[in-house]
Amino acid sequence: MSAAEGPLVVGVDTSTQSTKALVVDAATGQVVARGQAPHTVSSGAGRESDPRQWWDALSEALRQCGDAAREAAAVSIGGQQHGLVTLDERGEPVRPAMLWNDVRSAPQARRLIEELGGPKAWAERTGSVPGASFTVTKWAWLAEHEPEALRATKAVRLPHDYLTERLTGEGTTDRGDASGTGWWASATESYDSEILAHVGLDPALLPRVVRPGEVAGTVRDGHDLPFSKGTLVAPGTGDNAAAALGLGLRPGTPVMSLGTSGTVYAVSKRRPADPTGTVAGFADAHGDWLPLACTLNCTLAVDRVAALLNLDREAVEPVSGVTLLPYLDGERTPNLPNASGLLHGLRHDTTGGQLLQAAYDGAVQALLGALDLVLDADADRSAPLLLIGGGAQGTAWQQTVRRLSGRPVQVPEAKELVALGAAAQAAGLLTGEDPGAVARRWNTTAGPVLEAVERDDETLARIAGVLSDAAPLLERGTSEK
């Protein structure tokens, strides 16, 4: 390891499928060590993970970082949002965590919206209309289907909260991740007592919301990680807010993240409140807002189509009239939790490469449909779209986004932006800087800019038409999921 110019910090990304750790030089942003370990996620009706494997994965990822992790002066955890972690009086999981892409709580989401004033009231109150991904709907599902688990629950956490608490011994969260629960009111920046009472959740079970820039705690004794006792622990945040920190985002710059889920978002000074539910009015991690639209089906769904066709994910061919809506896990944008994948326009001469390109088109169209709603009215519509996430490095993803957006696309060379954003937050504790300023000093958005091409309005219109015509079928879903 080359000598660092400044103190070392650790940024962590505990995502759906793995936990990644970066050891970063706070002065330069240079990644001096990295590690990664996988998680397992249940299949079948729901999507669940045992939270204890996140801790084990964190331990393994840090072990891979070697001596550099032992020298860290501060650490921060970024994590998948919305997951419901229920803990007993000993801090052990009562049951596996229900993850963000577990859509079994769709009926509870619809009922909660109706019972508490409708979509407009929810948007004005919490910033978002809760879909099946939101934590409050999962708690309501648990109350209906597993009441014994609720009775055993003595603490409720989000995935990043769980790891932070195991480090510090204190139950904390941040405004960014809390804003995805459905029980944190963006209008007051506090937990909503009426919503909590309605779903039977004692606020004493919830973590303290740590302010941006505040120290969440220090690393305690009795853990098996390489950190020294007293190492500073930052608040952490949800994955999208962490990536926004990692990019050093300023208001108005659009981002499209291509991962297991797909997201489009931008930082805004205005508190969002979209009554249609397309845009979630999340808080960001340093005092502004992060209007965001999310799809459940992105890289994983397209890779599944490629695997079914026995094709490399880059083996696409120009589409001619075929439409594939890759809603393999139900869908959030558009709000079709019971949907499955749908293929239209198949002909004798349709090729596998065309089907694969149609899957890319279907995934990207869903994201672009929400982009204008995410951006403020005065945002520059010709500004480059920042393309991040695992899919951003793929040529087929890049070209599909260019063709369907008609915008220039910039692909930052910095990798692991969630972990990098967490590292910037940890560095801010040491230097007193805003984490976004830290990331800008690290020049994290540097990367090639792909010029704009003419937008493919014909494909966008065709996909929108199929989606409209098939809506009743997609809403009904299949008997087996």
Feature-to-residue mapping (PLM):
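A structural motif corresponding to the C-terminal end of an alpha-helix
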Residues: 198-205
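Conserved small-residue
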Residues: 21-23, 29, 75, 102, ...
